[in-house]
Amino acid sequence: MAATLKRLLPLLCAAATLTCGRPQRIVVGSKNFTESDLLAEIVAQQIERRTGISVERRLHLGGTFVCHQAITTGAIDLYIEYTGTAFTAILKQPPIADADSVLRFVKADYERQFQVRWMAPFGFNNTFAILVRHADATRYHLATISDLARVAPRWKAGFGYEFLERADGFPGLARVYGLRFSQPPTAMDLGLTTRALADGKVDVIAGNSTDGQIAALDLVQLADDRSYFPPYQAAPVIRSAVLERYPPVAAALAELGGKISDSEMRRLNALADVAHRDIADIAREWLTNRLP
């Protein structure tokens, strides 16, 4: 009898594993810039501390389309997306200015098309920021993107790869504002654009309005006086199947809704990009202070 039980024990353990299902684990990804990495780490730590579920990080994966493919194929379960990006780049809609309308549309279409759920936005709007050096803004009296059109024929521009191709990026911006630069804009990694501008390699870039380096590098954001850019509210997007498998995750993510303002996001980004602090430490400190 004992020998029989000994032979059966591995099979019984395997059966128990199958019955109980796979080990609890969620895979969190991020795009290839600091803010996305930082928010993904905040989300990962929030899930771990509130639910006890193990989180695998796959940070700095790539751009919007890489992360979108990863979540729709199940390679990751969650990442941080922006409403205007989803609306124009993924769902191929023309840019509109109404934030609530954009959020409602992406929520409905993501659930219907991709079985992906939008959670509550963090609270800030990270729009594209057309940036110039402070000295140039003063010298040429630049306050708006319309002002930029006056000097653009003598200037060099440097833009991220996505911005050069997206429906809400450079092609539409150039059309709306009549921008014509001295040469075709230089394509570069988004994370390199601010330093290229500060170092004088280019004269204007498209960055992020919540970039912590804007103040540190003495850059100026030109006002979008023709309201070209749509709203870009950041929020976790997660596969619906994951929420069904792990119901407590929804409550954990809901706690993050509305907790980060534009200025707070700039401060957090600056801690990473200017003070060079570890993003895991920044995330842990923020969660401890804001959601004890």
Question: Whereabouts are the PLM-identified features?
Answer:
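Short, well-ordered beta-strand elements
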Residues: 23-36, 53-59, 153-158
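A conserved helix-loop-strand patch within extracytoplasmic ligand-binding domains
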Residues: 100-157, 240, 258-262
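Alpha-to-beta junction loops
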Residues: 72-81, 152-156, 172, 197-207
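An extracytoplasmic/periplasmic, membrane-proximal ligand-sensing/linker region
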Residues: 164, 168-169, 174-176, 247-292
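Beta->alpha turn/N-cap motifs
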Residues: 60-64, 74-87, 102-106, 133, ...
